A protein has these predicted regions:
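A short, gly/pro- and small-residue-rich
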Residues: 91-115, 163-172
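A short, well-structured beta->alpha microelement
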Residues: 54-74
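Sec/Tat signal peptide C-region and signal peptidase I cleavage site
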Residues: 22-26
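Charged, low-complexity C-terminal accessory regions
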Residues: 27-29, 36-38, 150-192
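Short, charged N-terminal beta->alpha structural module
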Residues: 30-56
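Bacterial N-terminal signal peptides that target proteins for export
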Residues: 2-12
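Structural recognition of alpha->loop->beta junctions
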Residues: 129-162
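Bacterial N-terminal signal peptides
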Residues: 11-21
Length: 192
């Protein structure tokens, strides 16, 4: 009898852990489609976000070198900007971190003018928090975001959760990149 009760309790706890494998800090903020996804640092995170948007049925366009003018010409409601850099990616794109920061500052300024929701996403883990370029990418995007999504190992120092608390930005913490579908579904109010 005791074994059955213990098994039942353990099973319930296991299900709850699975259901809540990501946590949210801050007030709930929702966003609308269509979505444009870009990167501040030319890492492959934008491609991952774009693909995971598709998995939950979200209408997104990936534009690695997104400029403010493109926002003026299109009717996007949300911009998702991935944080973290790739030296190879920036080299292939013919850019550097200073140019990336200037480009993204322009995108953020235009997005705010249009009343778009800005989502900052650091979903590639601590490997994208190793140098000054990564730091510049993060500090360009995170404080200006309306919502932050961060992978747990990217937040070991609690930078993102502390920033969210300080600025009133909701922060969604996920354990693994593939779990990005959970906060995306919640933020865009879609059922998977």
């Amino acid at each position: 009898m005791k074994n059955m009760k213990l098994k039942s309790i353990l099973m319930t706890m296991f299900v709850l852990v699975l259901l809540f494998s990501f946590s949210v800090q801050g007030a709930e903020v929702t966003a609308e489609q269509p979505i444009v996804v870009t990167t501040c640092g030319q890492s492959p995170g934008a491609l991952m976000v774009h693909q995971l948007c598709g998995q939950v049925g979200l209408n997104s366009e990936k534009k690695d070198l997104l400029e403010a003018d493109y926002l003026k010409e299109n009717d996007f409601k949300t911009v998702i900007i991935t944080m973290g850099t790739s030296g190879k990616g920036m080299g292939a794109a013919g850019t550097d971190m200073q140019e990336e920061a200037e480009r993204i500052n322009g995108v953020i300024e235009e997005a705010k003018k249009q009343g778009m929701t800005i989502i900052g996403a650091h979903i590639e883990g601590e490997a994208r928090r190793v140098d000054k370029n990564d730091e510049k990418s993060i500090k360009t995007v995170a404080p200006e975001s309306d919502i932050i999504i961060v992978r747990k190992d990217s937040n070991k120092d609690n930078y993102f959760t502390d920033l969210g608390e300080e600025k009133g930005i909701p922060v969604h913490v996920i354990d693994k990149t593939l779990q990005l579908t959970e906060p995306l579904s919640e933020i865009f109010q879609v059922s998977k």
